[in-house]
């Protein structure tokens, strides 16, 4: 930015900044936040008109017609969740992403296990996202993580997520942890652990610093599920077998401890 403009940047009124920033792309907004403290302060308000406008431009009106985004209360957080949502180009051919951008629908195809990955993978930091299953689970309903090398569709009804060394999953049907084709015990470690009920909120917590994967159900921490994860890029992933089942995923950002 020109030195003369930088000198006067802190003195630009908020209403003028709002007008200027409303014409910028997201990457430009990120750069603007680095110009001066005043601009950083303005853009740190995740509910201001600039973020609202960006949110309305990028998200479908269908995304606001449900309570899915209630877990990400600010406009900037909703926008971030959209960019982390299911990838329509990285899912089984029997799956399509609904107009809201956050929910996948598995078509009623017999003898097929079908999955989907999120748009963005993680190799560093701590990340959390919420998964909600709508419709019957069938014999396989697995939630977890996978690399780009993991299969996303296979013939038959099979615990695809966790079937190889590139994926880790929790089968909500029988509460088994799955990796590399093996069951790694019941989860959570409770006597007669309750089964997942359709509509309950599952929170997936990936800690790339400690190399662990954990889960919460209805805001109750269930414990660490997997440890010693390799240094790879992991994507939010699910695998399903039941026809017309729908699975929503909302990225939350870093998990809140406590």
Curated annotation (Swiss-Prot):
Q: Which SUPFAM superfamilies match?
A: Concanavalin A-like lectins/glucanases, F-box domain
- Transmembrane feature ranges: none
Pathway listed for it is:
Protein modification; protein ubiquitination
List the InterPro entries. B30.2/SPRY, B30.2/SPRY_sf, ConA-like_dom_sf, F-box-like_dom_sf, F-box_dom, FBXO45-Fsn/SPSB_families, SPRY_dom, SPRY_FBXO45
* PROSITE patterns on file: B302_SPRY, FBOX
Localization per record: Synapse
Q: Tell me which residues make up the B30.2/SPRY domain.
A: 64-256
Primary location group: other
- Keyword field contains Zinc: no
Task: Name a single GO cellular component.
Answer: neuromuscular junction
Which Pfam families does the protein's record reference?
A: F-box-like, SPRY
Keyword list (alphabetical) reads: Neurogenesis, Synapse, Ubl conjugation pathway
Domain F-box, chain residue ranges per copy: 6-54
GO BP terms in the entry: negative regulation of synaptic assembly at neuromuscular junction; neuromuscular synaptic transmission; proteasome-mediated ubiquitin-dependent protein catabolic process; protein ubiquitination; synapse assembly involved in innervation
**SMART domains according to UniProt:** FBOX, SPRY
* Top-level taxon of the source organism: Eukaryota
How does it associate, per the subunit comment? Component of an E3 ubiquitin ligase complex composed of hiw and Fsn.
Q: Which protein family is named in the record? A: Belongs to the FBXO45/Fsn family.
Q: What does this protein do?
A: Required in the presynaptic motoneuron to down-regulate the levels of wnd and restrain synaptic terminal growth at the neuromuscular junction (NMJ).
> What is the protein's given name?
F-box/SPRY domain-containing protein 1
Its taxonomic placement starts with: Eukaryota, Metazoa, Ecdysozoa, Arthropoda, Hexapoda
């Amino acid at each position: 930015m020109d030195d003369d403009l930088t000198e006067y940047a802190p003195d630009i009124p908020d209403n003028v900044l709002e007008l200027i920033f409303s014409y910028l792309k997201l990457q430009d907004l990120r750069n603007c936040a680095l110009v001066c403290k005043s601009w950083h302060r303005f853009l740190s308000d995740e509910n201001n008109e600039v973020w609202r406008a960006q949110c309305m431009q990028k998200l479908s009106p269908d995304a606001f017609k449900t309570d899915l985004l209630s877990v990400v209360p600010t406009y900037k957080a909703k926008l971030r969740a959209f960019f982390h949502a299911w990838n329509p180009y990285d899912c089984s051919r029997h799956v399509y992403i609904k107009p809201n951008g956050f929910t996948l629908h598995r078509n009623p195809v017999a003898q097929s296990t079908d999955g989907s990955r999120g748009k963005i993978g993680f190799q560093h930091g701590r990340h959390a996202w919420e998964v909600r299953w709508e419709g019957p689970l069938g014999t396989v309903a697995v939630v977890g993580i996978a690399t780009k090398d993991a299969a996303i569709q296979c013939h038959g009804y099979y615990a695809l997520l966790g079937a190889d060394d590139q994926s880790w999953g929790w089968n909500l049907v029988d509460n088994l942890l799955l990796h590399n084709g093996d069951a790694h015990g019941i989860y959570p470690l409770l006597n007669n652990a309750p089964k997942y009920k359709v509509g309950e909120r599952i929170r997936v917590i990936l800690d790339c610093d400690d190399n662990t994967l954990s889960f919460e159900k209805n805001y109750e921490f269930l414990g660490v599920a997997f440890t010693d994860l390799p240094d790879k890029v992991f994507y939010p992933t699910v695998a399903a077998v039941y026809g017309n089942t729908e699975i929503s995923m909302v990225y939350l950002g870093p998990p809140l401890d406590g």
